[in-house]
Amino acid sequence: MLAASFKRQPSQLVRGLGAVLRTPTRIGHVRTMATLKTTDKKAPEDIEGSDTVQIELPESSFESYMLEPPDLSYETSKATLLQMYKDMVIIRRMEMACDALYKAKKIRGFCHLSVGQEAIAVGIENAITKLDSIITSYRCHGFTFMRGASVKAVLAELMGRRAGVSYGKGGSMHLYAPGFYGGNGIVGAQVPLGAGLAFAHQYKNEDACSFTLYGDGASNQGQVFESFNMAKLWNLPVVFCCENNKYGMGTAASRSSAMTEYFKRGQYIPGLKVNGMDILAVYQASKFAKDWCLSGKGPLVLEYETYRYGGHSMSDPGTTYRTRDEIQHMRSKNDPIAGLKMHLIDLGIATEAEVKAYDKSARKYVDEQVELADAAPPPEAKLSILFEDVYVKGTETPTLRGRIPEDTWDFKKQGFASRD
């Protein structure tokens, strides 16, 4: 029964919230304790029996470029904070399971984990609706879960099983869900696609925007700047989100970028930098960014300052280009899950014992999902499967060409069209 409470529910539009919250946060070398107070005012979307809280963010939470930063005060429900905590714990347990499965050689190939960066996926999802689009780089497992995929479907895909979100054909870098367009294995290639998603929203007069995520390592790609230009030229509702985790593979940002204030890279596009280790600040900044785009102001560059605890990928120990002391300092002083846990206890949303029970239930739930994913069969070893899953089901063409014309597949015949 406990496991059922961790099933990801579709996000709903949060209305009537002001701006940001205050939490223990650290930007650069500044660490500040937030102040919070309960309020009697209830938002209409609050679930029955829950109270709202007023959250005050430290002044160091944001740094802006060509715009006024978000408010440092906003109101949200206790239920929302609790759900965000549960989601971050699930994502971390899922990533830890990926680590173990990779080491057990059940996951092969590329695998990029986001342990330490959970606040970004969870904070964004709580600030938007299912009408909005998200597209990311290859570090995408948490986003896939937050967009509605099950832990089982994510892990099954990583293990090459038919129950995976891409039917076992995509692997770690090619995960998809409704409103989530991947996962992209080419550095920076998702950015122009994200601009295209924003154009589609604009063309169809949809009340939605595109959150297009890329890393500091991709920020110097030419196609990123080309996308900036097109987005500003056409006033597209796109939020260019730079996940600055300080290292592009094993190269520190300062060694690869002449200017590391990525939120200012848009030049003619306003920008905002936010403490990406603080989910409450991430939520407020993301909501601000969406409101900015939908108000007709055009694109926005949003930089999330974050940190990955592990290496670039499973083949990288992550300790040859940074010290263990640096990693431990970030874990002990800036962990997004530990920070939100403190708020849950301080606000009386949950006791220490209840939080431990949530953690235990999350561990049990993910373990069960691992077993289900591991038990799922791989794609059937038949020739026709190479030509399946190209088109949306129900829209398939009668034939599909392969590498050469002679390799054209006939779906009705279930064989090559030009062969007996």
Curated annotation (Swiss-Prot):
Pfam family name, one: E1_dh
Catalysed conversion reaction: N(6)-[(R)-lipoyl]-L-lysyl-[protein] + pyruvate + H(+) = N(6)-[(R)-S(8)-acetyldihydrolipoyl]-L-lysyl-[protein] + CO2
KW Membrane (keyword) present: no
Regulation: E1 activity is regulated by phosphorylation (inactivation) and dephosphorylation (activation) of the alpha subunit.
Cofactor(s) required, per the database record: thiamine diphosphate; Mg(2+)
Positions that bind thiamine diphosphate: Y138, R139, G185, V187, D216, G217, A218, N245, H312
Binding site for Mg(2+): D216, N245, Y247
Subcellular location: Mitochondrion matrix
Post-translational modification (record): Phosphorylated at Ser-313 by pyruvate dehydrogenase kinases PKP1 (PDK1) and PKP2 (PDK2), and dephosphorylated by pyruvate dehydrogenase phosphatases PTC5 and PTC6.
Binding site for pyruvate: H112, Y138, R139, A177, G185, V187, D216, G217, A218, N245, Y247
Entry keyword GTP-binding: no
Record's keyword terms, sorted: Magnesium, Metal-binding, Mitochondrion, Oxidoreductase, Phosphoprotein, Pyruvate, Thiamine pyrophosphate, Transit peptide
Residues recorded as bearing Phosphoserine in the entry: S313
EC number: 1.2.4.1
CC annotations in GO: mitochondrial nucleoid; mitochondrion; pyruvate dehydrogenase complex
Annotated function: The pyruvate dehydrogenase complex catalyzes the overall conversion of pyruvate to acetyl-CoA and CO(2).
Record-given protein name: Pyruvate dehydrogenase E1 component subunit alpha, mitochondrial
Species of provenance: Saccharomyces cerevisiae (strain ATCC 204508 / S288c)
Lineage: Eukaryota, Fungi, Dikarya, Ascomycota, Saccharomycotina
